[in-house]
Structure formats: structure tokens, C-alpha cells
């Protein structure tokens, strides 16, 4: 088979991405020469070594033991550590290594795969597995393990609620929905031990992003078959990540140990990580008592630690992929009128609304938060729903609600949850009343009831948050708002031009061109009032001065573990306390 040639534009794109990862022109030429196909341009940049970079006079602590948790980080006992079967098991991500992982800028880079390539259109992807990839028992972790694990996730017998994550793979959906008898037609095939070939339903330029998602980590087949649902207990677990599970004392503590068989073990400095399972209501007290080296912060604790001279330098904000927004139901008055939907967008005083969040939210003007792939910062788009009370009232001219009168009864419906959701919703109610004279009744529903009504398009106006699953605009736009979805659709709103931009973004191989389609989609959705962005979620943490190695993104912010980035423990190290 003849390999396609690399164009100048593709070479420039590759050079740009490698430069962002710290690779110079000479290094770029070496990497480019080794690419198996131009389809992988941009995905083969390797992360830098995690080896400690000590300051002059600084010494590594003799005991490399990190105490981590509290403030909402692993506040409840995990149901398992089996992300392959249950994405939201609440387990420890550092036990696992996927084919790809995400760097501090949420870009996919090779991990267990040493190289990734594709055909010209991006419909067939090939992952070359590194030959030093091993399980924690020392046995090889191969392409066959990934084939078995991914098909296990799709298997209807697994009853995996998140199996649709793999529906881009050819044959995955019919297999998962029991429309075919077995997995033989699923487009995941190990070509020997070290090559995994994945055939998709069509061009999917973002597929390496999916391969880096936590749901794509492998499971150890012998352990699963021997121990069943108990295979991730500490005594049974065989994993392939930088750490192993030494102890799991349920509802009390998790203890991790460095995995000596991990292919990157030489760059992992920590020997031990202790994660006590601490309820959120315990606050920051364990950190203040020097029982923790690193912790998440809640509202009251944030103010106190940030204001105290002894701790203010330990507090930092970190990027979090979450957005609060409103979805007006276009089938229900008064939101069946686009002028009303646009008026609501102009009536939201976002600066005022986020004040109730005490630093845990910032005003949003689009779906994707800054610092994440696909984020849009375009004045034209920012102006579509800018706060402008006069423009809001002007939008109502010619409608039955001109002058802010004759509003029907309006319910603002939300899910019952923490995370500062209700105060923000109440702040939205206040600004709608102030600037549109629209009185709303807040309806708070149990999550299961809320979800059923959401998918049934039963609510007039919905207050909802979206936490990004994987860092690609396909997730924020296609998975959330695509009008042709047959299930799991959150709103009745449909816009054909919007859908066409999403389809083009999905099917386009070139990264820059894809982002243009998604920016157009954002503009179309806001112009039509398909949704109203209100606030981006922010999170805060504190870290002791002797903890080093946290990675920073291009915005200069520390990045910590979540469901996207999970590289904190391999990078962190401790120095002698002053």
C-alpha cells in the first residue's frame, strides 16, 4: 500500500505542535522522519521527562510519600477501580495507563502507544504499542489486552452505562445493542502483540483523544475472569499504570505504591501515595493539621486559607472542564419565540450571577472554558448574548411579552445536587426578574426524575451543568446538542445549519479546519438561542511548599487530576522541608 506524502501544511502543523511540547526543529525532523503516516501529525509529540528539576541547594526528601485528598477528592469509597467497565467508579486513575494520555494543555500524547498513525481520511487508526509495556505482575501488556478490554466495554453482558463512548468504532453500537451475536464485526483488531488497528464508522480526526480518555484504559483479563467484580480489590488487582494498589481499607484509606514494572518507572519519584477517604464536610482541617500535603478546597476554606498569611501562597486555582448554562425549551411558551430566547441571553448579568459562587465560577460566553481545546474567544460571539438590559427589552418588541409583560408561569428546573448549583440558579432567577420582569419558580428534582424529564423535553427552562468527558469540541457540541440524536438528547431545539457544522467537524481530519466548524456552530447556536452560557466552573486546591512537580498549562495554571488529566502522581516529588 502506497503511503501518502506529507504536505507542507501538515509539516507546519506538526512543527507547531512539537514546538508547543518543547521540541526544537532538529528534534522535529527526527520525529517527522519516523512517522508511519501523515494522518498522525500532531499526535506523536512526547511529553517531557517527569524527573525532578531541583533548585540550587534543594534536596529530595528521603521519604517520597505524598498524602493527598480531602475537600471532595475521593470523598466516598470507590465502587471499584474498573474504569473499563464503569467510568464513574470513583477509583484511582494512576493505577492505569491508556494508549494515549493528556498533557497539561489537554492535548493527547502517546503513552502505552509509542506511535499513532491513520489512513489519509482518518477512518482507520493504528496504535503501535511500546514493547516495554507491562502489567504490575511483570507480564506483557499488549495490543490483545486492549482489544479484549474495549470489546468487554461494548459487550451487552457488561451492562456498561457508558459503552456509547465507543460507538465511533465500526460495529460497536450494533454489538452493544445485541443486534449482532458477537464482537467479530467490531473494528478493533490486534495485529500481533504490538499493533492495534481500529476501524471507525467514518473519518474521525479526534479518535486519539478518545483513546486517551479514562474509559479506554485496559482491564487485566486473567484477574477479571478469576475474581469477577472483586478483581480490583487490593489483594487481586493487576494494573498497568505508574502505581499499584497496596492497601484498600474500605471507607477509610487507599495506599498506592510505585509500580516497578511501569515502563516510565525511572521518571516516577514518589514511592508511596496515601489517600484517606475524607467526607467533604471535614473541610480543610486535615490539611491544616499537616495530615495532608495536597487537598481540594471548598468555599469557606478557600476564603480563610487565601486570606491567612501562612497559607495564602499555598492556594491555587486550577482549570476545570465545566460549564453552567440554560436550555430554553423551544416547544414551550414563551421560549418557542427566538426573540425571547435572545432576550434571556442579554438579561443575564453574568458578573453579578457568579458572585454567589465565591470564586468557584467565572462568567462564560461560550461552551468550552479557556485553556481547553476548541475554546472560542471571539468578540463577535461574545457580543451575541452580552449583558445588555436595553437590548433584552428591545428583543421583546413585537412579541406578546413586550415591555416584560404577560409572561406565562415559568419554571426553572434543575437537578438536586451540590457543587454550588442552587445559589447560581437563584441568582439567575434574580437577574431575569430584574431585567425582564420574568418571574420564575425554581423546581429542584431528584437526579433520576430530572434526567427522565430532560430527555423527554418536559421542562420549560433548564439550569444544567456540563462536565467535559474528553477534551475535544465534538464532546461539547455533538454529544450534547446534535439535533439528529435518537436518544439522550437534552433539548428539543434543532438547527440544520448547526448540525451540518458538527458533522463537518466530526468528519474533517485537519485540526484547524475542525475548530473553524465548531466556532461556527457556537455562533449559530447562540444566534438561535439554542442555549445560554452563564458560568464556567472553577476549582481551588492547596499544596504544601515541599510538594513540587505539578505541571502548568499555557495559561500558567497548575493542572491536577480529574477525569481527563491524571498525571499528578507520576510528576510530583517532595523536597526537604525548610
Model regions and ranges:
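Extracytoplasmic/peripheral linker and loop segments enriched in polar/acidic and small residues
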Residues: 186-189, 354, 385, 438-455, ...
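Structural transition elements
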Residues: 335, 362-399, 416-423
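Gly/Pro-rich hinge or "lid" segments in bacterial periplasmic/extracellular proteins
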Residues: 103-107, 172-174, 178-179, 183-185, ...
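Ligand/substrate-recognition segments at binding pockets and active sites
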Residues: 68, 250, 397-468, 511, ...
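Long beta-strand-rich cores associated with HINT superfamily self-processing modules
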Residues: 543-578
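N-terminal secretory signal peptides
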Residues: 1-27
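N-terminal lobe/hinge region of extracytoplasmic solute-binding protein
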Residues: 67-121, 236-239
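Extracellular/periplasmic solute-recognition and catalytic clefts
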Residues: 246-257, 274-332, 355-356, 362
Amino acid at each position: 500500500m502506497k503511503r501518502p506524502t506529507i504536505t507542507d501544511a501538515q509539516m507546519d502543523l506538526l512543527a507547531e505542535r512539537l514546538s508547543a511540547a518543547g521540541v526544537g526543529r532538529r528534534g522535529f525532523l527526527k520525529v517527522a522522519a519516523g512517522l508511519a503516516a501523515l494522518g498522525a501529525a500532531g499526535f506523536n509529540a512526547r511529553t517531557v521527562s517527569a524527573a525532578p528539576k531541583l533548585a540550587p541547594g534543594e534536596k529530595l526528601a528521603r521519604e517520597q510519600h505524598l498524602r493527598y485528598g480531602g475537600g471532595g477528592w475521593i470523598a466516598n469509597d470507590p465502587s471499584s477501580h474498573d474504569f473499563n467497565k464503569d467510568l464513574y467508579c470513583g477509583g484511582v486513575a494512576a493505577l492505569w495507563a491508556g494508549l494515549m494520555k493528556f498533557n497539561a494543555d489537554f492535548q493527547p500524547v502517546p503513552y502505552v502507544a509509542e506511535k499513532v498513525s491513520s489512513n489519509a481520511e482518518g477512518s482507520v487508526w493504528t496504535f503501535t504499542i511500546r514493547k516495554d509495556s507491562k502489567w504490575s505482575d511483570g507480564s506483557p501488556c499488549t495490543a490483545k489486552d486492549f482489544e479484549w478490554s474495549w470489546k468487554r466495554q461494548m459487550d451487552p453482558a457488561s451492562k456498561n452505562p457508558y459503552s456509547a463512548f465507543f460507538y465511533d468504532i465500526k460495529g460497536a453500537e450494533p454489538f452493544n445493542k445485541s443486534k449482532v451475536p458477537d464482537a467479530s464485526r467490531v473494528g478493533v483488531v490486534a495485529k500481533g502483540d504490538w499493533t492495534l488497528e481500529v476501524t471507525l464508522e467514518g473519518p474521525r480526526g479526534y479518535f486519539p483523544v478518545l483513546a486517551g480518555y479514562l474509559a479506554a484504559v485496559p482491564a487485566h483479563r486473567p484477574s477479571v475472569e478469576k475474581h469477577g467484580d472483586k478483581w480490583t480489590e487490593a489483594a487481586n488487582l493487576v494494573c498497568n499504570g505508574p502505581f499499584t494498589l497496596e492497601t484498600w481499607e474500605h471507607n477509610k484509606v487507599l495506599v498506592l505504591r510505585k509500580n516497578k514494572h511501569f515502563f516510565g518507572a525511572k521518571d516516577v519519584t514518589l514511592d508511596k501515595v496515601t489517600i484517606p477517604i475524607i467526607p467533604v464536610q471535614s473541610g480543610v482541617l486535615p490539611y491544616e493539621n499537616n495530615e495532608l500535603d495536597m487537598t481540594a478546597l471548598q468555599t469557606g476554606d478557600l476564603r480563610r486559607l487565601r486570606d491567612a498569611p501562612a497559607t495564602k501562597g499555598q492556594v491555587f486555582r486550577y482549570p476545570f472542564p465545566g460549564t453552567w448554562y440554560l436550555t430554553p425549551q423551544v416547544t414551550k411558551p414563551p421560549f418557542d419565540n427566538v426573540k425571547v430566547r435572545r432576550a434571556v441571553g442579554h438579561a443575564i448579568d453574568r458578573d453579578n450571577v457568579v458572585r454567589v459562587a465565591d470564586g468557584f465560577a467565572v462568567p462564560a460566553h461560550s461552551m468550552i472554558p479557556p485553556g481547553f481545546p476548541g475554546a472560542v474567544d471571539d468578540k463577535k460571539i461574545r457580543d451575541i448574548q452580552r449583558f445588555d438590559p436595553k437590548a433584552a427589552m428591545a428583543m421583546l418588541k413585537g412579541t406578546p411579552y413586550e415591555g416584560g409583560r404577560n409572561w406565562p408561569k415559568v419554571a426553572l428546573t434543575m437537578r438536586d445536587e451540590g457543587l454550588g448549583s442552587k445559589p447560581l440558579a437563584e441568582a439567575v432567577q434574580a437577574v431575569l426578574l430584574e431585567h425582564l420582569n420574568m418571574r420564575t419558580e425554581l423546581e429542584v428534582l431528584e437526579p433520576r426524575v430530572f434526567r427522565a424529564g430532560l430527555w423527554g423535553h418536559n421542562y420549560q427552562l433548564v439550569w444544567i451543568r456540563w462536565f467535559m468527558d474528553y477534551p475535544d469540541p465534538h464532546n461539547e457540541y455533538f454529544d450534547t446538542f446534535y439535533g439528529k440524536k435518537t436518544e439522550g438528547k437534552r433539548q428539543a431545539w434543532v438547527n440544520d445549519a448547526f448540525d451540518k457544522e458538527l458533522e463537518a467537524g466530526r468528519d474533517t481530519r485537519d485540526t484547524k479546519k475542525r475548530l473553524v466548524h465548531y466556532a461556527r456552530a457556537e455562533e449559530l447556536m447562540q444566534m438561535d438561542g439554542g442555549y445560554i452560557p452563564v458560568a464556567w466552573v472553577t476549582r481551588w486546591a492547596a499544596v504544601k511548599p515541599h510538594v513540587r512537580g505539578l505541571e502548568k498549562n499555557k495559561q500558567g495554571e497548575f493542572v491536577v487530576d480529574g477525569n481527563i488529566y491524571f498525571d499528578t502522581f507520576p510528576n510530583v516529588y517532595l523536597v526537604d522541608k525548610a
